[in-house]
Each structure stands twice: as C-alpha cells, then as structure tokens.
Amino acid sequence: MPTEQLENGFSFHGLGTQISFPRGTVATVDGDGRDVVLVWLFDYRGGYALLVIDAETGETEEFPVPFPPGDDCPYASILSSMNRFYTLFNGYFVEFDVLRREYSFFHETAPRMAMGMTEDDDGLIWSSTYPQSGVVCYNPKNGDFTDYGHVYEQNWRQYPTTLAADDTGWLYFGIGTTLSQIIAFDKECGTGIPLLAEEERVKGSPSVFRDMNGKVYAIPPDDTAWAAENPGDEGWFELYKGERKTVAKHELKEKLFIAGKAFHFHPDFPNGKKLERCDLADRELEVSDPRSGDTHKVSFDYSSEGAHIMGVARAPGDTICGGTFFPRRFFSYNPKDDSWIRRESYAQWNTVVTQGDLFFVGGYGSGFLLEWDPTRDWVPTDKDNPESNPFWHRICTPILHRPHDLLAHPDGKTILMAGTPGYGSTGGGLLIWDRESSTGELLEHTDLLPDHSTMSLVALSGGKLLGGTTTEAGTGGEKKAEVAELYQMDLSTKVIDWREALLQGGQSYTDLCVGESGLVYGFVDRARFFVFDPNEKRVIQEMDSEKAYGLTAFQQGPRVFVVAPRGEIYILFERGIGLLDEGSFEIDLVAESPVEISNGGDVLEGRLYFTSTSGLYSWELP
C-alpha cells in the first residue's frame, strides 16, 4: 500500500505488520462434524475476534467478541466437555458454542482477566483472575453465573495462573509472583482461604493439579517467577475438602482438560488427526493423519489491523526501523522508494537507538541487548551463532528484564540500557555497555536507588549521567518507593553523587532531553513539564502540560522528545506535535495530529516519524 497523504502535512506510511497473534488455539469439531480450528485473535485493539478455520478447506469465519476488547486479550481459555470455548478478559466472561457457531453467553465481571480456567466434576466452568484473585463460576446447563469478586487481596498484582477443583467442589489456585500463596475457595460461602502461613510464603508461584483420584496436589515454586512445572521431592501438599496435607512427592495421574494459558495450543482433533501448525503470519494450516501418514496443508485468511509498534528510530542507511509486539516483528521503512521490509524479530524490541553505523535494541523479555549492522545480510538472531545479524550481546534478567530506555552516549562507544526488573521483583538495574571491548557492567537497583527503576536517561557534560526513575515494580511486583527521583551518576566511577525527589508526588520520569544550553527538559507522569538546571540541581520551571496539551505519547520505551538536525526540540503529545522555545520554555502546539500519537520518534529527510497504535506516520517539518 503506497503512502497516503493526510491533512496538515501528515502522512500514513503503513502498518508495522498486518499480522495478528493467537491467544489460544484448539482443534475440535463443529456441529456438522467438520474439523475446525479455533483461534482467539489479538491485534492492537486487544482480543477482537474468534477465528474459526475449516481444517479441510481453509475457509474461515470471524466472530467479533460481543464486548469491547479494551486493549486486553485472553490469558487463559478452556474448551469444555460440552464443546464450548471460554475465556475472560477486559472484565467479560464469554462462551462460544462451537456446535452452533455462535456466542451463547457473556457477562461482565470484576476486573480484569482470567489467568486460570478449569471445569469441575459437575461441569461448572471456573476462572481465577488477575489482578486480585477474582473468582467466577458459570453453569452452562442452566446459565447461572456467579461473580464472587476479589477473594484475596494484596498490595501488588497477583497472577493466579493454575486452577483446579477437587471432586467435592472445592476450588484451589496458586498465586504469585511477589509472594507465593495457595487459595482454597469454598463456593458455599464464597470465601477464599489462604493455605500458606506468611512465614511459608516465598517468591514465585506454586502450581496446583487435579489428580484422577479426585484430589488436588500443589507443588512449591521453583526458581522462576511463574508457576512451577518441574517439581522436586519436597514441599508437596495434598488438597482436599479445603484442607492441606503435607505429602511426599506424588506420582501424578493428572486429569486433563483442554485448557491453558495465553499461548495454549491443543492439536488433537476428536477423530485422531493432529493440527501440526496454525501459522497466522504465513496464513497456513497443516493437519496430519497418523492412520494414513498423510499431511494436508491449506491456506486461510483473516482480518487484522496490526500489532502495536513499540517505537521507531532512524537506522544507518536512512531508513526508519522498529518492532511490534504480539506478534514480535521487525520492520524497516525506506522513504526513498516507499518500500518496506518486514521480518520475524528476536523477541520484543522495546527500545531502539542508532550509534554511529550500528542500530541497537534493548528488548523484553530477559533484558537483552542486540546490535544490528544494516550493511550486512540479515541473519536471524541466535545467541549461539556469532554470525547472527542482529548480534546477541547479553541478557540482564532478572536485574533488568523490561527495558524502558536505551541511550547512545555521545562518546560514541557507550550504550546504556535501563528498565524494570523481572516478574515479582522491585527495583531495576542499569547496563553500561562498552562497544569497543564488547563488555558491560550491570548495576543493580541497590547500586543506584533501592526499590526504584530507571525510566529515562541523558548524558551531561563532565562525564555525568542524569537518570529519572519510576516507582513501578517489575510486573507483578510490589511497589515500595513512594515518589520518583532524579539522580546523577559519575559514569567513570559508577557512583551516584546526587539524588532528590524534586517533583512532589511524581511516580515516573517519562522522558528527558538536554538542550543547547545544557538545561534538561522532562516530563513526569506524562502530565507535568519541567526544566532542570543540572549545575544548580534545581527545577527552574514547571507547568501542568496535561491541562494545556494533554498527555504525552507513551510506550514501554518512550521517545517523547525528538531533536531535529538543526537542534529544534519537538515534543510528541497524544493529540499533536509541540515545539519547545528554549528561551521562554514555552511549548507551541505546531501541529494537531489526525491520529492519536502513541510513540516516537525520529527525524529523517525533513519529516518527523512517529507511531499511532500499529501504524507508522510522519509530519513534514517547517
């Protein structure tokens, strides 16, 4: 699709990718006895539809969800014994009747999405929900629906990712990730009972499994934040009638359900055939028949409005490059001939920046650092392949798991990556990477500001570094710091020589930018603009920018400030583009955007490039 010219000097160049992501895939049979594949579809809007694919012909039918997706999506789903497909997200429980090919029930619930789903011995459908251990029950035989609300609250967001019911009707789920807990739920009185004493709780998530003997077994957390999958010999519990009993390692004979978490893939058709592949990128489906040994491949199609773009930057060779998430794809746009290159990327490119003739990527998960040379052939990233391009340097998890800023230092050799820590943790680290030696030093939050994570960075004169923090913990972690701070580090010694919470009540320094005079401009919580004098260590001006211009643009790696080649500082707000007057510190909204701006941002050949949800746009500079 060629670039579309919009009003007021804006242009729409296309989508980063026109592929959706599967959030639960199951093989089953419809009411006519035909093999079908069900896929929950996810693009920038959220979980927008259920796709039903005829496994023989590739014919498809889409069923838009009967409620607003709200930028949320399925994190758990289950195909019941009655051949009905369930999920719960954005505060809505929904049932799809496969035999009749229609949504047969939906109901609003307490926030927000199911992390675990199961079916009990009476055929009741249960879900355990994020963020505060919500419990929902649905009876498909008579349509009775009960939302028990949040039954176990903490001051951090809980992930109740495994769920099981014993043969007496008691429900159990394990939660994490900040501290483990097992909840027994009594449906008769609608209460959740914690089974672990406070002193027994550790970081991570226990797992629960239903056994064929009618009881539920729980295993303790392993060395990850997520539900344990590789149990040891110690710490097992037998759960029955709401009580726990310590037992030796149990040889599980698990009662199986067609249920799973976000990326659940159930390949078995009732007639014995097997779904080998359902590829939304290539739009191909492959089914094998173990009896005949034959494999059948068909093409299919579906609608998609594309995945969220994380952020974009000018790459060497004068292209605009970036990445999308779910699906995780790389793209490169060349304005010279209005052409695109799109490829599968190595995980999620949260932050991107150019230094010299190389393009760097800071990514989620695991806090990885990549280096891409656009002059060489693309070789898919493999950390064990030294010929990879992009080249994999290292990971930083759990100290730094989700990058929020990637700074190309003006010394031409140093790359700094900062962000939040792994799941269930508080306080993120900082990677200082030396390109010349291909070595880096990873500082922990205790080396910086304990219980803070660095959200934004700029280089100051004299070998100093200025950082702005966020009080947000890692996903599912406990927030401990009360207010965000600015800090100054000596880059040679890696020592913090100044820190202060200058802006009262601020929770996150969204982005920072150094002006020609050496003053630093920034935003707090996307809503407050300030000017900071790094010599005097004080804020010399502050304004409520939200009131005047609305919130700034935002993504996991914010690029709110865009500096043009002649030094002009542009600011990306959701509603338009601002120009900063460095003399008066006033902001002039020079262009109202025809679309809501999501993130930046870079300048190339006289145009300022930015993103809006899944699309790449630009505006002609004056």
Regions inferred by a protein language model and the residue ranges of each:
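Surface loop/turn motifs at the tips and blade-to-blade linkers of beta-strand repeat domains
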Residues: 13-21, 64-69, 106-110, 149-155, ...
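Repeated scaffold domains used in trafficking and secretory/extracellular systems
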Residues: 19-29, 70-78, 111-119, 156-164, ...
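Residue-level signature of beta-propeller blades and closely related beta-rich strand-turn architectures
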Residues: 43, 91, 131, 177, ...
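Short loop/turn segments that connect beta-strands within beta-propeller blades
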Residues: 55-58, 97-101, 139-143, 186-190, ...
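Short, conserved, GDST-rich strand-edge loop motifs in beta-rich repeat architectures
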Residues: 223-230, 417-427, 467-483
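Blade-level signature of beta-propeller repeat domains, shared across WD40, Kelch, NHL, RCC1
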Residues: 595-622
